[in-house]
Amino acid sequence: MSHKSAEMYELKKKVEELKSYRGRATELVSLYIPAGYDINKVMQQLREEYGTAQNIKSKSTRKNVLGALERAMQHLKLYKQTPENGLALFVGNVSEQEGVSDIKLWAIVPPEPLNVRLYRCDQTFVTEPLEEMLRVKDAYGLITVEKNEATIGLLRGKRIEVIDELTSNVPGKTRAGGQSARRYERIREQETHEFMKRIGEHANKAFLPLLEKGELRGIIIGGPGPTKEEFVEGDYLHHELRKKVIGVVDISYHGEYGLRELVEKASDILKDHEAVKERQLIQEFFKHLVKDTGMITYGEKEVRKALELGAVDKLLISEGYDKVRVRAKCNNCGWEELKTMSEGEFHVYKKQLTHCPKCGSQNITFEKWDVAEELIKMAEESGADVEIISLDTEEGQQFYKAFGGLGAILRYKIQ
């Protein structure tokens, strides 16, 4: 997986965190500086906003906005020029206790160039420009066709979406002979033609907007019999969409299962696509597990050890993995404890650990960081590949449920 994919994963987690905060008033500052924009002009704007904010009537809101702007200006002094892809700053009081100030700052250099210049002070952080970067833009159109039913879908990233399911009234074959049989066959052919037209209309409606936006990479069509070839060869799809047909595949199922089978059977056509690569990767992991080769490991403690030894070839992290590493330290006697837990468990742990278990002091501080980000950094330092496993595939769900969403394929066995 590319370094950019790991960056996108980290960006997604930061966006989710930013969206979880809500200010008590319009006091959360979002600042987007596009690539190539003069950072001195931004500083000048913030000074003007600082002057305006001094007129805010509410004392607590005024204090929080001024504090956020001061922190933002202080941070911008670290930059001689805007980073290559631009910069997004989010600053504000995120304390859940009224009257308590806890001004935090997030500085994000995005994995793609920012083209938005924005300053906003609101109750929530503005994350839409970053969310647009996270949106998977490339898509493949999927169509399964039978005589009496069809499914239209999309493969976008690793997710298969069902857009439309259609059924027809095409009658089955008859055993009658003579003119009755010929009349019956003409009716059947006409019904089939009308159904094909309807499939084409629905496919055009689904795929043409994507084609116009430059997001449609190709169309794959599947089905159990010759109907799929009749559909492809007939004048049913828009002529521009017909040019995008990159494969016609034999499949057995219809509906959502049919779309999944279509993607699986078209793996040669889609060999460079994320969903196919992910399936092959998880299959490789399971193969080592079944054969007990000793060339995989899973679980946070085991994966961390393998990374420290430089034994990891591919680090596998599920999108659903959400553990944090927490260090509790007594500033009186020096006692400390290091644990891995979920975000929810951390809030309980912090409330319960009010006194040092060694000396009884209440002077305890907590340090918290994201386990996935820490392990990704360790992997990159040791030259290991990082693979983010989605929850949009059956294999991805299985990896998350069975192994907690964290595993590794090794370079060599660990004794």
UniProtKB/Swiss-Prot annotation:
One of its GO terms (molecular function) is translation release factor activity, codon specific. InterPro entries: eFR1_2_sf, eRF1_1_Pelota, eRF1_1_sf, eRF1_2, eRF1_3, Peptide_chain-rel_aRF1, Peptide_chain-rel_eRF1/aRF1, Ribosomal_eL30-like_sf. GO terms for cellular component: cytosol; translation release factor complex. It is found in: Cytoplasm. It comes from the Archaea. Disulfide bonds: none annotated. Keywords: Cytoplasm, Protein biosynthesis. It holds the Pfam family eRF1_2. Heterodimer of two subunits, one of which binds GTP. Belongs to the eukaryotic release factor 1 family. Directs the termination of nascent peptide synthesis (translation) in response to the termination codons UAA, UAG and UGA. This is Peptide chain release factor subunit 1.
